Amino acid sequence: MQLIKDYVEQHKGRMLEELFALLRFPSVSADPKYKTDVLKTAEFVAEKLRDSGAENVEVCQTAGYPIIYGEKIIDSSKPTVLVYGHYDVQPPDPLELWKTPPFEPTVRDGKIYARGACDDKGQFYMHVKAFELMMQTNTLPCNIKFMIEGEEEVGSSNLGIFVKQNKNRLKADVVLISDTSMLSMENPSLETGLRGLSYLEVEVTGPNRDLHSGVYGGAVANPATILAKMIASMHDENNHITIPGFYDKVIELTETERKALNSAPYDEDEYKKDLAVEELWGEKGFSTFERTGTRPTLEVNGIWGGYIGEGAKTVLPSKAFAKISMRLVPNQVSDEITQLFTAHFEKIAPKSVKIKVTPHHGGEPVVTPTDSIAYKAAQKAIKESFGKDPIPTRGGGSIPIVALFEAELGIKTVLMGFGLDSDALHSPNEKYDIFNYYKGIETIPLFHKYFAELSEE
């Protein structure tokens, strides 16, 4: 451990500057205007993998943005760890809410503020620097492969094809991902599962054009009003989702599982204070931990229609739109939930409007085994680095590739994230603690060490 700490201390300035350089690339995969920047980011990542000691580094072309592959095979008889991450980021909007430019990393109070600081540039780059550390100190105990994609934030639409076409190249014993969070740096945790996702857009159309609200208001259905009513009807008075069949396949936690989940440290007042809300909201009968990790949800991600510019324009809009995401739990299937939503949405629509539902992307929920060699290696690594055992938690987010790895490669994933829920992922002023960045670089080599040792027992 001291060797690791010494190397990080000696090179921490350069390691931070390299991360800053990565964060300056506006690699927004959702917006075509950033295409050149996304491609430049891919080349930068490939260059840094080569500099760190990776071999057979390749910028692999896809129908979308490239996937970066690299490896270091020290001994074919040794176990292999496949590291996954993504170099694309969410759009920075709304820009006016950022205190500093989103693609000019700024340090305040020991935290790096930039889009992608935590999700996922800061976290995947820890693995690149941890790999460099092991190479430079001659302590790499197992084989390592990297697969860093550029389309995670838009559903990883080309990753499945790449994995299917490269099964031999991607052959490994475990996948290691840092794209999740810890409870806190005082209470380290390991995520034992992720929710799935169904993401779609709905369109409600009324008249064939925007109308004068004085001339036609009261006689013609307003699509914005209809859409708002339809969305509101999808939760009952207990905040239970009302789509028929939505909960049919949900596996309820046992009382023992619920008790274990809710034993994690949690300060509700601090939680509310951080979010600046007076009261929490959610499905009745479940705790915050359960609602955000083990229960399915339906959320409106965006809603618009009519005139939203400066000043006033008295129109009755022709159309209204919403983007909706549903987080899923084990046994629910993304495509099935999308179909249930679509059927219900069309059924509850009045005859005065027309409905269109467009699926975007989805992913399946996963649960990772806590009795595996890889999970035990992560436990030991975190305990040595932090001085205490990690608390098992269930993550509320979705990483569709995890289920894909299991289905196509037959391997499980370890979710060893170093972010915090308060890091404002997908929001203005995203941040990542510098302490967490260095702590990750120190902890990751320990995972490889213990994974290699436990694999030989």
Short names for language-model regions:
Residues C118-G193, S455-E457:
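Acidic/histidine-rich catalytic neighborhood of metal-dependent amide-processing enzymes
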Residues Y87-V89, M147-G155, S178-M182, G206-N208, ...:
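Acidic, glycine-rich active-site loops and adjacent beta-strand->loop/helix elements
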Residues K78-K145, K439:
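Active-site metal-coordination/substrate-binding segment of hydrolases
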Residues G217-N239:
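A short core secondary-structure module
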Residues S189-T205, V414:
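Flexible glycine/proline-rich, aromatic-decorated loop/lid segments
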Residues D51, S184-M185, T242-K319, P330-A343, ...:
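An extended, acidic, His-containing surface patch that forms the Zn2+-binding/catalytic region
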Residues C118, N208, M326-V333, G363:
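A generic structural motif
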Residues M1-L95, K319, E336:
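N-terminal helical capping/dimerization or prosegment-like subdomains
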